[in-house]
């Protein structure tokens, strides 16, 4: 099916960022926001060649005049027209390849609805005429990237978090838990608590500034109460941040109050369990014989696990929940922001994987439902 000299394309479509590149590479070539922007105002300059939509970084840089939309919500594609624009942009503008010449590996959220993976398959073969494609579960790829086939992955991106127990390469669907609490919620929460400090951030464009503050300054406290007391009595944790207009703001306990919401979702007015309890609950839904392997191989993945201090805190919290003699190991690879993509790059370049691709011929014979038989 797949000639050795043609590299497969690996596209990891996240709620916040799209990561794309070539199988066999150790990092994605293109990383851009999963955004489609449309002008808010009527164009007045004739002959400016104004477009009716912008994708990715271009939408980001023109955000002041655009309405920004994310076609992927909570990890699942909700707007297919915009999604097609993002894929088109990925192939033709970012990677500069002809999709009809390369097999394409796409990623999907755990528990992605069946109709969604069929639609992805259909668009790849019918709109982009790919010779072959495959859909892989994101968390499974992260586990491969860490060099394991058994473990539990806590994957948290911009739109959704999941705990996915995996045994010998197979995700265990009955034990997967989804938490609609991720990067975007933390950004919104930071916007809210900065407002209490007297700084006002409201528009979609300003949210991007707050996201940057979060990425640069936030961290997870090992002990929240102790940290709050430290913050109240000294200015040691205060940091300053320069806004695009030159104004400088000071950020204090917001730095760790923001990601604390991962462990205490009640901060966001959510009823759900924190990420440590969710991970524990997910392990407890698995067969008693494999739990030991999961505790010892807890892998963090995704951009919202990049906060300094998160692995130590996770270790502390899970030790408190687990049986006393249990060996617990939290693995937080430095490249975990891209580990889904890296896992895809590894998988698509394995010689044993080459017979797993869904070919155009198989698609023409069976239709979109072929994806359920070949990708699991």
Curated annotation (Swiss-Prot):
It comes from the Eukaryota. It is found in: Cytoplasm, Cytoskeleton. The modification Methionine (R)-sulfoxide is found at residues 45, 48. CDD domains: ASKHA_NBD_actin. It holds the Pfam family Actin. Its EC number is 3.6.4.-. It catalyses: ATP + H2O = ADP + phosphate + H(+). The keyword Cytoplasm applies. Oxidation of Met-45 and Met-48 by MICALs (MICAL1, MICAL2 or MICAL3) to form methionine sulfoxide promotes actin filament depolymerization. MICAL1 and MICAL2 produce the (R)-S-oxide form. The (R)-S-oxide form is reverted by MSRB1 and MSRB2, which promotes actin repolymerization. The modification N6-methyllysine is found at residue 85. One of its GO terms (cellular component) is cytoskeleton. The modification N-acetylaspartate is found at residue 3. Belongs to the actin family. This is Actin, nonmuscle. It comes from Halocynthia roretzi (Sea squirt). The gene is CA1.
